[in-house]
């Protein structure tokens, strides 16, 4: 099908749980992509993790052939996008390959902050956005209110939004018809030199690097020599094709199409995402505007439990970085935990997902330290440095000013939960920016310290609003704050992996809470274990894990008191000696205790 006017490239924008993966399943079923037997729920969420959590993490693509009512068969290239705030860069990658997007909104819940953010991204990239109301079969569906919300909050016309229910299949054909009519066809010239954008790439143990590309101009077929613009290397194409949703090889990929290219690239970083491909005969094709590198917001140390796994761990991280360009890592060593990596993530969910993927897909046992954000420090010498690890913090006497990252958070919440949300934001040292009443929902925007957001803000927000509030945030600026480093000492030895950077006002409270928590988690030893929290040289909190004691007098029946005293003295001497040489094993839960401080 070479006619460009019959191709439609689109993606779906939706908040978590508004039914985009189910809608995708319906599309695949209606266009006959899979037989009844192969149909299973959430076909595109291929990672077990995605299925379990019910979220889409990676972008996927599917090519479907839809015979419309006007008798023309259209090629629909559908690129699935994640909906969670941590994966916004995946969304911008998917959108860069499309001409249009379906904005799917749950007719019961209404517009959520996430869809608003992604929708703006789509509009900025010049895409045609088409609203769809999903879950119309639910009793609480209220299409008129939701249409009004779409118009008020996002500002696109929703008077003729298509109503459907992906679960029952009602109105899905109407969605496809409208899609073919409203979303523009791709532009591009098949005769021009090849120019293709890499949307995603992943590593296959047999095939090497598999790249998902959107061809802008020209064509590419098996046996072509392609040039990767950023590395300048040449590769021979082994096969090209599309996913429908299974791998299907095709003769070639032409302008306007989305598909995969396998070129036997063995080097993991041989085809970076956002790069441009062209033929070796036309090396001077312009580079397409790629995606911007996203800066990680949250850093945490990851350490293998057994130090023999270090090399496997490094390899696993390399493979994951290919598929997930926002993950960054640097080697790090800790006195308590040995060698590992300091990894940068986009947010807490991203961190959990990466850790689970490492443990599942690469069978590693990992210990994670508490996450921190990047702080900007102005030293007395006048230079500015950035610190992402509390144990790397220079001495307080050398620091002129400490600045913490502030994020601008947009929260959409139903009016009845507004009070709780405001209380939570104040507790997290937030400063209110503005408040808009939009029908039954309220949009509040706050400036919050990122340090407070990364720990448990999202979970707390969900619980105070009974799951109705939705959050979208982005980094805004660095701002001076009175911050201190809180060290944890176990038996008078600092444990570097447990250090935290906190606001001075919260330091005593945090120190107390942390030592109490550690007391529960550190197993009792044969001697007393002192757990202390200190700021510099000043101890702000202390608890003691009491010793286990063997009753050495059990074998004495009567007899002289000096015999008993001798045994007790002997035990005392043994305990004293033990305390000098004994070391305390700190369990994995203790390192994460920091996260669960109320």
Swiss-Prot record:
Reactions catalysed, semicolon-separated, are: GTP + H2O = GDP + phosphate + H(+)
Task: Name the major location.
Answer: membrane
The UniProt entry's GO biological process terms, in alphabetical order, are: positive regulation of translation
The record's Gene Ontology cellular component field reads: plasma membrane
Q: A GO molecular-function term, please?
A: translation elongation factor activity
**Amino-acid positions noted as binding GTP in the UniProt annotation, renumbered to this chain:** 17-22, 134-137
Using the record's annotation, list all stretches that form the tr-type G domain: 5-187
Write down the top EC class of this protein.
Answer: hydrolase
The protein's topology relative to the membrane is: Peripheral membrane protein
Determine if Cell inner membrane is one of this entry's keywords.
Answer: yes
Q: What is its EC number?
A: 3.6.5.n1
Keywords assigned by UniProt, alphabetized: Cell inner membrane, Cell membrane, GTP-binding, Hydrolase, Membrane, Nucleotide-binding, Protein biosynthesis
Q: Which domain of life is it from?
A: Bacteria
Q: Where in the cell is it found?
A: Cell inner membrane
Function of this protein?
Required for accurate and efficient protein synthesis under certain stress conditions. May act as a fidelity factor of the translation reaction, by catalyzing a one-codon backward translocation of tRNAs on improperly translocated ribosomes. Back-translocation proceeds from a post-translocation (POST) complex to a pre-translocation (PRE) complex, thus giving elongation factor G a second chance to translocate the tRNAs correctly. Binds to ribosomes in a GTP-dependent manner.
Could you say which protein family the record assigns here? Answer: Belongs to the TRAFAC class translation factor GTPase superfamily. Classic translation factor GTPase family. LepA subfamily.
Q: What is this protein called?
A: Elongation factor 4
In the UniProt record, what gene is named as encoding this protein? lepA
């Amino acid at each position: 099908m070479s006619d460009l006017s019959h191709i439609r490239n689109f993606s779906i924008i939706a908040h978590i749980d508004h039914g985009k993966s189910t809608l995708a399943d319906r599309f695949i079923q209606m266009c006959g992509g899979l037989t009844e037997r192969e149909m299973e729920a959430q076909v595109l969420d291929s990672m077990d993790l995605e299925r379990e959590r019910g979220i889409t993490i990676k972008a996927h693509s599917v090519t479907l052939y839809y015979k419309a009512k006007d008798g023309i068969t259209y090629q629909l290239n559908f690129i699935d996008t994640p909906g969670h705030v941590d994966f916004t860069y995946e969304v911008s990658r998917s959108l860069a390959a499309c001409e249009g997007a379906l904005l799917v909104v749950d007719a019961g819940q209404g517009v959520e902050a996430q869809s608003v953010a992604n929708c703006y991204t789509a509009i900025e990239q010049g895409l045609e956005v088409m609203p769809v109301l999903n879950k119309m079969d639910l009793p609480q569906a209220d299409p008129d209110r939701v249409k009004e919300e779409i118009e008020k909050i996002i500002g696109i016309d929703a008077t003729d939004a298509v109503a459907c229910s992906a679960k029952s299949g009602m109105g899905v054909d109407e969605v496809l018809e409208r899609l073919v009519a409203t979303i523009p066809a791709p532009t591009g010239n098949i005769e021009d030199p090849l120019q293709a954008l890499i949307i995603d790439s992943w590593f296959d143990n047999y095939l090497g690097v598999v790249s998902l590309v959107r061809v802008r101009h020209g064509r590419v077929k098996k046996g072509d020599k392609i040039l990767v613009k950023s590395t300048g290397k040449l590769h021979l194409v082994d096969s090209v094709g599309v996913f429908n949703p299974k791998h299907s090889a095709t003769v070639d990929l032409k302008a306007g199409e989305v598909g995969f290219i396998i070129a036997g690239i063995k080097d993991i970083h041989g085809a970076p995402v956002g790069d441009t491909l062209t033929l070796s005969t036309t090396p001077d094709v312009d580079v397409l505007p790629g995606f911007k590198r996203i800066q990680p917001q949250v850093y945490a140390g990851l350490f293998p439990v057994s130090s023999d796994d270090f090399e496997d761990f490094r390899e696993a991280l390399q493979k994951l970085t290919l598929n997930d360009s926002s993950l960054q890592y640097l080697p790090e060593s800790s006195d308590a935990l040995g060698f590992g990596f300091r990894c940068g993530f986009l947010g807490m969910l991203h961190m959990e997902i990466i850790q689970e993927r490492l443990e599942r897909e690469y069978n590693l046992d990992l210990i994670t330290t508490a996450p921190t954000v990047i702080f900007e420090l102005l030293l007395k010498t006048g230079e500015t440095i950035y610190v992402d690890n509390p144990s790397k913090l220079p001495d307080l006497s050398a620091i002129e000013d400490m600045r913490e990252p502030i994020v601008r958070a947009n929260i959409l919440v139903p009016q009845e939960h507004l009070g709780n949300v405001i209380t939570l934001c104040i507790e997290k040292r937030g400063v209110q920016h503005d408040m808009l009443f939009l029908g039954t929902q309220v949009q509040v925007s706050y400036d919050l310290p990122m340090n407070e957001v990364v720990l448990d803000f999202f979970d707390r927000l969900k619980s105070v609003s009974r799951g109705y509030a939705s959050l979208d945030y982005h980094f805004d600026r660095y701002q001076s704050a009175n911050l201190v480093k809180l060290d944890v000492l176990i038996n008078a030895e600092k444990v570097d992996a447990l250090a935290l950077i906190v606001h001075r006002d919260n330091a005593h409270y945090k120190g107390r809470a942390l030592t109490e928590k550690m007391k529960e988690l550190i197993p009792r030893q044969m001697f007393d274990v002192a757990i202390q929290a200190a700021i510099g040289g000043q101890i702000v909190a202390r608890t003691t894990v009491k010793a286990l004691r063997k009753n050495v007098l059990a074998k004495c029946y009567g007899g002289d008191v000096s015999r008993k005293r001798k045994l007790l003295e002997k035990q005392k001497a043994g305990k004293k000696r033990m305390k000098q040489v004994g070391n305390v094993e700190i369990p994995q839960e203790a390192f994460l205790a920091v996260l669960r401080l109320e």
